Amino acid sequence: VDFNKYADCNEQAGREDTCYERKGSLCRDKRNCTKTRCLGCGSVCEVCCDVCPNRANVAIKVPGLAKHQVVHVDGMCNECGNCAVFCPYQEGRPYKDKLTLFWSEQDMENSENEGFLAVDEDHFKVRVAGTVRTVSVDAVNTGLPEAVRLTIKAVRDNYPYLLKK
C-alpha cells in the first residue's frame, strides 16, 4: 500500500476536516480501506497527544495558523517516551521538540526545551533558539517567530486551564 499517495491527497488544501473525521477509524480489511483510514501525518498527526498517558501533549487551535499546534505541558510529563516511540517522524521527540509550557521558573531553568512561562496575565518568559526574553504576546514586535507568539496567545486566551495558577 502506498501511504504517501493517500498522505499527498490528504494534504491538499481544505482536507483537514476530512482527516479529523478519519481519526480513530477502525477497519479490518486493510487492503480495501486504507484511503478511509490514512490521516496524512503531514496534515493531521497528533499521535503524541493520543499516546501520552498523562495528556502532557495538547493539540490546540491557533487563530492565524492553518494547522493545530501541539503544546507540550512540562508539569504533566514524566518523560516516559511514548510520544517519541509512536512519532512517525524520524527521531521525533515531542516531549523535547514541541513548544513547552512551563509551570514554574525552576522547571524552565532545568530544561533545554524551547518554551514559555506565564509571568502575569500579559507577560510571558519565552525561550526560543537559546534566547530567553520576557514579552507581551499582544505586541506584534516581540522578536519571536509569529507562530510562537500566536501559540502562546492562544494558550492564554483559549486554553487558560493549561496555565497553572
Describe every region a protein language model picked out.
Residues 1-76, 121, 128:
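Ferredoxin-type iron-sulfur electron-transfer modules and their immediate structural context
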Residues 29, 35-40, 66-165:
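Iron-sulfur-cluster electron-transfer modules
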